[in-house]
Swiss-Prot record:
Keyword Electron transport tagged: no
Pfam families assigned to the protein according to its UniProt record, in alphabetical order: Pribosyltran
Provenance organism: Akkermansia muciniphila (strain ATCC BAA-835 / DSM 22959 / JCM 33894 / BCRC 81048 / CCUG 64013 / CIP 107961 / Muc)
Xref: PANTHER family: BIFUNCTIONAL PROTEIN PYRR
Official protein name in the record: Bifunctional protein PyrR
Upper taxonomic lineage: Bacteria, Pseudomonadati, Verrucomicrobiota, Verrucomicrobiia, Verrucomicrobiales
Gene from which the chain derives: pyrR
């Protein structure tokens, strides 16, 4: 349960509505192209799996994949601890596919830059789009989402995304200081 001292940005039903809107946007744009929805480990993959399910409910087939970007980060040598490596799961070729990369929170854009580098190691997609549940603003690189669940105007605020599959509940909160 979310402590009352935290600002609730989205609750479970709010996350569900946001993902529904994102799925409708994905389906409406570029219909007929082969589609893969690829989540960034560790929360983007959960969101991506839900988006695949919602897109399928709308009558569009989409392949699911997940990608670990740990070794592609530009701050890997500045980290105090070694990143924990997880296996990417892309059981299909991304060549000539429309790939929607999915992350939980978009902030500086550096994570997505790393994800693009990782994705190109798997092939040459026809088109890459970006979906994020939360857009925090604060870009340091020129990356913008194509599909967004919620835009925050709390520049620099820490955001915690919890997903039922990994954390037992769906919520997006801003912790109090």
């Amino acid at each position: 349960m979310t402590p009352p001292s935290q600002e609730i940005v989205l609750d479970g039903p709010g996350i569900s509505r946001a993902l529904e809107r994102m799925a409708h946007g994905i389906v409406a744009r570029f219909p007929g192209e082969p589609l893969a929805i690829v989540g960034l480990l560790s929360q983007g993959d959960v969101i991506a799996r839900r988006l695949v399910d919602k897109v399928k409910e709308l009558g569009v087939e989409a392949q699911y994949g997940s990608i670990d970007i740990s070794l592609y980060r530009d701050d890997i040598f500045k980290l105090e601890a070694r990143p924990s490596l997880r296996s990417s799961n892309l059981p299909f070729s991304t060549d000539d596919m429309r790939v929607v990369l999915v992350d939980d929170v978009l902030y500086t854009g550096r994570t997505i830059r790393a994800a693009l580098n990782a994705l190109f190691d798997y092939g040459r997609p026809a088109r890459i789009e970006l979906a994020c549940l939360i857009d925090r603003g604060g870009r340091e690189v020129p990356i913008q989402p194509d599909y967004t669940g919620h835009v925050l105007d709390h520049a620099g605020a820490k955001v915690i995304v919890s997903m039922k599959e990994a954390d037992g509940e769906d919520s997006v909160v801003i912790p109090s200081h």
